[in-house]
């Protein structure tokens, strides 16, 4: 009897519960919508401001939600709460390597276009498996995904 119940539970788990759901954190990236965005200590306008961000399109990792607020974490591990009106679905990333080469095509054998320094904000047009097409300032090109923070 015990063996039958165990087998039944096992099949129930396989067919009705997704293993991805068991392990996923449901974290995703958005960007800051405005030039100035307040990061608060809690999920309400009643909480004090911890940090005033002054960088539009800064990528942030969404970790939790509460009504109209989202708990975020930035590339420097600062975390707090931001109102949803201050967030955008536009794709951007921060260069996290000391230097990252911007190439003309999505291969290391193409011509280098520019050398991007750590902390540089790039807007993302599209991504392939290992490369992203980005724009920063007057430069367009491809960079390795490994050198960017703001992508899953």
Task: State where each predicted segment sits.
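SH3-family beta-barrel domains
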Residues: 21-41, 51-56, 63-138, 145-152
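Second-shell loop/turn segments in exported
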Residues: 43-47
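Extended hydrophobic/Leu-rich segments
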Residues: 2, 19-22
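Bacterial N-terminal signal peptides
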Residues: 8-17
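Bacterial N-terminal signal peptides that target proteins for export
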Residues: 1-9
């Amino acid at each position: 009897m015990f063996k039958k119940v165990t087998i039944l539970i096992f099949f129930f788990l396989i067919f009705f519960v997704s293993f991805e759901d068991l392990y996923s954190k449901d974290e995703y990236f958005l960007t800051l919508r405005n030039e100035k965005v307040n990061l608060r200590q809690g999920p309400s306008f009643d909480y004090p401001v911890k940090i005033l961000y002054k960088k539009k399109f800064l990528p942030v990792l969404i970790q939790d939600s509460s009504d109209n607020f989202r708990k975020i974490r930035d590339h420097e591990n600062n975390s707090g709460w931001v109102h949803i009106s201050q967030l955008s679905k536009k794709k951007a990333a921060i260069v996290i390597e000391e230097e990252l080469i911007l190439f003309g095509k999505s291969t290391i054998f193409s011509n280098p276009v520019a050398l991007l320094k750590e902390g540089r904000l790039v807007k993302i047009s599209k991504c392939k498996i290992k490369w992203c097409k980005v724009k920063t300032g007057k430069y367009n090109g491809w960079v390795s995904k490994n050198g960017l923070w703001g992508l899953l």
